[in-house]
Amino acid sequence: MSQPDVFSALGDPTRREVLEQVSARGDATATELAAAMPITRQAVAKHLHVLAGAGLVEPRRAGRETRYASTPAPLGEAIAWMADLGAQWDARLAELKRSVS
């Protein structure tokens, strides 16, 4: 899992919706998610595969089913990276304001 993988996975609106559904439910199967979405189970499974590759969900076998649960760590890392980037821009903007005034 890397930040580019996380941002790439989150770049698709359907994948974001799948992740939101998994997070809201605690865990879910592709079949359960597809029943609540306007896409097929196969499409949901493909999106879950991408999310799992980015570390955003964790698959767990439960008998014949695979249940997916969200994993918050990659989102936290992405948020921290964006916060650091925002702080750098704030510092540069403050420096620019000081030099202009």
Question: What are the roles of these predicted feature ranges?
Answer:
Residues 14, 43, 50:
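Residues in the helix-turn-helix
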Residues 35, 46, 52-53:
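Alpha-helical residues within the helix-turn-helix
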